[in-house]
């Protein structure tokens, strides 16, 4: 324990943690009587708790079957007490379903399989007579929960959400009970949902490519197979195997609990013992390992990607895992090579010799790898770019770097670790990852601290050991992989008979007394110091309670809607130096100060982000001032921007999601859609570097908000910023560049054909007439949540849960500032991702829901509570609060925009929501747009025409090029 305290103290010194806030990093580790590991981290900076249950079982423990991932889905279906009105009567039907699935897995004859599937469908409908859909989610929401989710990786599975602190007893009861007696109910629908998830990954070009890379590297090892499993195995699930998986791995001795946030870590142990201590201890399973096989000889493997023009390759070397004795030295070595600013490989990019040369590492529990990414300039030879990159690796092996640069990179790693622990969610996720790796928090701290002791000899030694070894060269080849097809089985919908019902368990849980707490809202006067620096420049400073690292964000009120060329300007500024500093020299200077600088742009603003150490704030800002005042574009940096624009232009419609986003803009804004005003590659080339810099100069005359979070006082920051940033140039008044969503006089159906899409994406869009007060917008907010905001929403239950028509469903209200644009219309959209052969059924279903919305009082109450929970659980972190205040003030607010919302939400009724629906949505069916991205061969055009005039869109209709 003394050793751990010493190491923690040393780490805190290096990264500048404030002594009075050491508790934020303190993790209390304990073990319950059943062997369950518990990590507690108390942090009162935000009024919420992040809770996660970790199971040391993942895809490597059931390779290629998808069982771990299947079971993750099942864990939301309830228990013998949650999610059922009578488990004793439900159980025989569930047992029969399980037997049928086992029989299905052993049957190959198509006719016999079809008969078994129909039997499963009939049995599932009988079992549904006893099920209460989504009761677990409903109870989580009722007791302050939000962001409910889970994830399966190769090494572990975890279940998590955020909740309001006064409900910690209910959270512990619910999340322990769900693991004691889980029930495999409503499995038919969940099985098809997993099919839909498989479709989603298949349409993602990077996911498919990474699967090929992983399979090539690991061969027959468990890590070789995708987490979700093979299509063939997905079609043949065995519930008996899942039950065996649960009994083996879901035991106290193999599980962990992480709580991080606003609770008392010293007094919570009895509650945890009473709840999570009830899980069976079991025998901690002996898990297999999945090492990366030795790479004995260099080999080249082609990987298909449908990205034109660009050549690319990745050289993958075997490397140690995170806690191996060589891991930290290799981490430093790779940081020396590639850090995004001034590494040895970065120099090749900074000097325009190639589009990218970078190094990275990734680690699983049993295997590690290092990769070097090489992307030559357009039309240049990959072999030449590879040789230049390997030459930089040779420099590293030879020790051709200074002691100062080594120290700088070690400090950079420390800062990255410090930043990863700043907020409740980030820290909790780090705790989950460390716990699942089988190491203690003390070992994690020691491992981070060990970076400080890495020497130059250590770096050169590991570079020679790992980066001179044989590697696998993955070479990009233009093309796409064929997709295996999943077809819908023709099941009848399984609609539970007990929607809106409540189990006896839920009634008992309601007896636990709850302390009423008001939501914490942003106080513009207390949560930030606000001061004017010029006519239209405002400074916001927020105290950093954790460490002595600062963030400075400068947000100018000019984005791509005002000047589409700014996309290219942003790219240029991230790649140039000044009249006296090359990009590499600028990067070195920033790193020496422990700082970083980057530019970004969106539709309404152009931003400069600076991070660093507070003790170096003044020299850092002086360097930024030098860059802003003396930036200089060279021919190579301009060419890099042009090449990037060309590549992007050739890939505008490769991603189905990108096409969907463009269609949404087109549907909502017509010819005003930003994609129709994008700057073409030809125009970028014609601009040249000087014109791009001039465009940035014009940006700095716009209104700007400067947001600082750090340990310096407002007066100190004001003095330094006022002397280093061009705040006096910000004279143009703030402009709101958002547009009103447009109406449709008649229904229309837009279709963008994607012949190889395994999944169809579609959305509905309709304008909603103005809602001019908070009181009018409350029912709209409730309707949006009720329609598609969570697992108890209409879209989730009717489209995904009951009818297995989709994996992704949702809805969203698009609105402008109530203070600035009270008289502006709003818009309502619904979004669905569905298997291609289910498209017409899914469209028909969504249309019927919008025309005749099912009203359920219990689900309304859940939606209302979820809206309240968002207000309670979304108080921003210290890094976010300044930007939130700035944004709200620009939108006309003088106090938190959510002031009074929780009270009004609680008073709202289902009738209020129904009236909004009937007057704004149901009555609007003839003014709706339906937009579809998918394979037109899967569409029935005659049937589709019932929803409006069918218009096929082409690339030129959505993108200017």
Per-region residue spans from a language model:
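Positively charged n-region of N-terminal signal peptides that target proteins for export
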Residues: 1-4
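Hydrophobic h-region of N-terminal signal peptides that target proteins for export
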Residues: 10-18
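A common structural junction motif
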Residues: 177-184, 275-283, 391-401, 625-635, ...
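M16 family metallopeptidases and their MPP-like homologs
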Residues: 39-41, 46-61, 67-70, 84-177, ...
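Hydrophobic, small-residue-rich alpha-helical packing segments that form membrane-like cores
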Residues: 186-191, 207-208, 222-233, 239, ...
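Short, conserved secondary-structure transition motifs
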Residues: 195-203, 291-305, 410-421, 610-614, ...
């Amino acid at each position: 324990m003394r050793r751990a305290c010493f190491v923690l103290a040393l780490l805190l010194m290096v990264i500048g943690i404030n002594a009075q806030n050491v508790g934020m990093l303190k993790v209390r580790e304990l073990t319950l009587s059943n062997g369950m590991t518990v990590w507690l981290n108390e942090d009162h900076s935000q009024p919420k708790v992040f809770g996660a249950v970790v199971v040391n079982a993942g895809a490597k423990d059931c390779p290629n079957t998808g069982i771990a991932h299947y079971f993750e889905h099942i864990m939301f279906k309830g228990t013998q007490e949650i999610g059922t009105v009578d488990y004793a009567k439900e159980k025989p039907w569930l047992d029969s379903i399980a037997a049928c699935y086992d029989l299905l897995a052993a049957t190959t004859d198509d006719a016999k399989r079809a008969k078994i599937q129909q039997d499963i469908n009939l049995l599932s409908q009988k079992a549904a007579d006893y099920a209460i859909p989504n009761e677990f989610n409903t109870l989580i929401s009722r007791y302050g929960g939000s962001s409910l989710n889970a994830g399966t990786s190769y090494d572990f599975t975890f279940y998590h959400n955020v909740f309001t602190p006064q409900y910690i007893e209910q959270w512990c009861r619910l999340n322990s009970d769900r693991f004691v007696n889980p029930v495999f109910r409503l499995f038919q629908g969940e099985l098809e949902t997993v099919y839909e998830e498989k479709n989603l990954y298949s349409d993602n070009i990077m996911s498919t490519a990474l699967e090929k890379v992983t399979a090539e590297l690991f061969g027959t090892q468990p890590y070789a197979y995708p987490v979700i499993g093979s299509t063939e195995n997905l079609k043949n699930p065995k519930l008996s195997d899942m039950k065996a998986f649960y009994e083996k791995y879901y035991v106290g001795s193999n599980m962990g609990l992480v709580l991080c946030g606003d609770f008392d870590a010293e007094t919570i142990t009895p509650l945890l013992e009473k709840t999570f201590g009830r899980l069976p201890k079991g025998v901690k399973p002996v898990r297999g390992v999945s090492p990366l096989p030795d790479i004995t000889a260099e080999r080249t493997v082609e990987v298909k990607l449908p990205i034109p023009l660009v050549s690319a390759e990745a050289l993958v070397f075997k490397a140690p895992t995170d806690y191996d004795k060589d891991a930290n030295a290799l981490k430093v070595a790779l940081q020396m090579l590639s850090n995004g600013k001034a590494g040895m490989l970065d120099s090749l990019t900074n000097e325009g010799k190639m589009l990218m040369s970078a190094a990275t590492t990734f680690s699983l529990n049993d295997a590690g790898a290092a990769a070097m990414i090489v992307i030559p300039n357009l039309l240049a030879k990959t072999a030449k770019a590879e040789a230049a990159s390997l030459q930089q690796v040779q420099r590293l092996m030879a020790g051709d770097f200074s002691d100062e640069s080594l120290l700088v990179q070690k400090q950079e790693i420390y800062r990255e670790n410090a930043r990863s622990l700043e907020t409740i969610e980030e820290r909790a996720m780090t705790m989950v990852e460390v716990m699942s790796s089988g190491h203690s928090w003390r070992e994690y701290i020691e491992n981070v601290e060990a970076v400080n002791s890495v020497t130059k000899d250590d770096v050169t030694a590991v570079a020679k050991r790992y980066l001179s070894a044989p590697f696998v060269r993955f070479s990009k080849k233009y093309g796409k992989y064929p997709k295996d097809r999943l077809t819908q089985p023709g099941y009848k919908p399984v609609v539970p008979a007990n929607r809106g019902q409540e189990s006896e368990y839920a009634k008992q849980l309601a007896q636990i007394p709850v302390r009423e707490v008001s939501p914490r809202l942003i106080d513009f006067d207390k949560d930030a110091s606000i001061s004017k620096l010029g006519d239209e420049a405002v400074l916001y400073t927020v105290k950093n309670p954790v460490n002595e690292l600062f963030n400075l964000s400068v947000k100018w009120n000019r984005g791509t809607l005002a000047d589409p060329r700014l996309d290219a300007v942003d790219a240029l500024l991230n790649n140039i130096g000044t009249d006296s500093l090359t990009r590499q020299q600028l990067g070195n200077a920033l790193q020496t100060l422990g700082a970083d600088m980057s530019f970004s742009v969106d539709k309404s603003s152009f931003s400069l982000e600076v991070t660093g150490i507070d003790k170096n704030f003044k020299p850092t800002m002086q360097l930024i001032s030098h860059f802003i005042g003396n930036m200089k574009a060279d021919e190579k940096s301009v060419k890099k921007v042009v090449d990037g624009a060309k590549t992007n232009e050739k890939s505008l419609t490769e991603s189905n999601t990108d096409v969907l986003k463009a269609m949404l803009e087109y549907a909502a804004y017509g010819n005003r859609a930003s994609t129709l005003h994008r700057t073409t590659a030809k125009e970028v080339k014609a601009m040249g570097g000087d014109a791009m810099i001039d465009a940035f100069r014009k940006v700095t005359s716009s209104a700007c908000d400067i947001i600082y979070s750090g340990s310096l006082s407002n007066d100190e920051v004001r003095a330094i910023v006022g002397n280093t940033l061009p705040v006096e140039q910000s004279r143009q008044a703030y402009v709101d560049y958002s547009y009103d969503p447009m109406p449709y006089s008649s229904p229309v159906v837009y279709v963008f054909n994607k012949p190889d899409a395994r999944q169809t994406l579609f959305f509905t869009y309709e304008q909603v007439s103005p809602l001019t007060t908070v009181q009018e917008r409350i029912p709209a907010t409730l309707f949006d949540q009720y329609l598609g905001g969570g697992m108890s929403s209409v879209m989730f239950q009717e489209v995904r849960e009951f009818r297995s028509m989709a994996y992704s469903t949702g809805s969203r209200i698009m609105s402008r500032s109530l203070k600035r644009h009270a008289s502006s219309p709003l818009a309502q959209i619904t979004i669905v991702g569905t298997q291609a052969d289910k498209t017409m059924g899914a469209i028909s279903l969504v249309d019927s829901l919008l025309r005749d919305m099912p009203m359920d009082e219990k689900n309304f109450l859940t939606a209302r509570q979820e809206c309240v929970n968002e207000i309670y659980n979304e108080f921003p972190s210290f890094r976010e609060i300044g930007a939130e205040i700035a944004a709200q003030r620009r939108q006309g607010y003088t106090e938190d925009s959510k002031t009074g919302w929780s009270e009004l939400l609680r008073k709202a009724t289902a009738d209020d929501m129904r009236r909004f629906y009937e007057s704004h949505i149901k009555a609007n069916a003839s003014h709706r747009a339906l937009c579809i991205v998918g394979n037109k061969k899967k569409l029935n055009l005659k049937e589709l025409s019932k929803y409006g005039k069918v218009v096929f869109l082409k690339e030129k209709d959505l993108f200017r090029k």
